[in-house]
Structure formats: C-alpha cells, structure tokens
Amino acid sequence: MIDLSAPAIEVAPLLLGATIWRGPVGIRLTEVEAYMGLDDPASHAFRGPTPRARVMFGPPSHIYVYLSYGMHRCVNLVCSPDGEASAVLLRGGQVIAGHDDARRRRGNVAENRLACGPGNMGSALGASLEESGNPVSIIGNGAISALGWRLEPAPEIAEFRQGPRVGISRNIDAPWRWWIPQDPTVSGPRT
C-alpha cells in the first residue's frame, strides 16, 4: 500500500508502475519528481502556503494541479502529513485505459507521447485547475469507478533509476527524479 502521508521523496519511487485514474483514463506512471516544500527552492511551496501552493500543505492524498507556461496543466499528488508541504509531479506514463479520451485531448501524436511530459500527462487525464485540492482514492484489485481521482498501486515495485529533476532552475542537483529505464514514455533522459 502506498502511504501518501510520507514525504514525497519516499513516495515517488513507489509510484512507478502504479496507475493514476481520472474517469475512464488510466495511465501507468513511468516518470515522477518529488518537490519538498519549504526545504526545496524549486517547489511552489518554498515560500509558504500562497494561494497557488496552499493545497501542497495538506492534507495528503489530494491532487495539486497548476498551470505551467500559461497553458499546460500539471498534476501532482500531495504527500506528507497535514501542514507539511511536499508533492510528487507526475511527469510521464503509458495510457492503459481510456485511449479514445486521451487521444481526443492530445490529438494525433504517437502512442508513447500521449502522456509523455507533465503537461501532456495533465492533458491526457483531462485535468483542470478547478480539481486542485480534490481527493485521491487509493484502490486495489483493479476496481475503478467512473468518477474522481484514483491511484492503483503497482503489483510490484518497478526497476527504476534516480537522478536530478529536469526543467527547473533552482535546486537542480537534488536527485529527486525517478523513472523506469528505457521506457519510451519517459520525457527526460531515459538511461
């Protein structure tokens, strides 16, 4: 079982191979990054609970959606105990269910690009800014409902690599990016 009340740096590698669900769309996670709140200059929560980052301060097991470059909706899972800020950015994954919905949202792109990169992930899932702060249910046994955000843990921990995050300008050396090596849905370096 994944415990989202743990810090993001502990949760992130456990998410590889897990499936995030929103409605009928399911995406197997292949790349994630941790952001550690007040201790991480690259985190939106670094300056405290601003209106944008307030949801990162808990409670855990909620979605944090933000707009990147004014157009990309990026999805994070809020972690850590209530009052402490950390979140895992969902950077890449493989669409395993709801292909028609994901394809309608993403257009005519290669299958491995449907949810490759955090903005594409948010688009494939159909995430909206209004959903920021909505709860995430952790499910098992393949049971899904048509509503809400759900996280289905991987049947086993995936082999992974760890290294620096990508696309940031602060705290760039923190090794808080995890990915499944050689997976074509990983957006950053794959080796």
Swiss-Prot record:
Gene3D superfamilies: Methylpurine-DNA glycosylase (MPG). Pfam families: Pur_DNA_glyco (PF02245). One of its GO terms (molecular function) is DNA binding. SUPFAM superfamilies: FMT C-terminal domain-like. GO terms for biological process: base-excision repair. It comes from the Bacteria. InterPro entries: Formyl_transferase-like_C_sf (IPR011034), MPG (IPR003180), MPG_sf (IPR036995). Its EC number is 3.2.2.-. It is an enzyme of class 3 (hydrolase). CDD domains: AAG. The keyword Ion transport does not apply. Keywords: DNA damage, DNA repair, Hydrolase. HAMAP family: 3MGH. Belongs to the DNA glycosylase MPG family. This is Putative 3-methyladenine DNA glycosylase. It comes from Cutibacterium acnes (strain DSM 16379 / KPA171202) (Propionibacterium acnes). The lineage of its organism: Bacteria, Bacillati, Actinomycetota, Actinomycetes, Propionibacteriales.
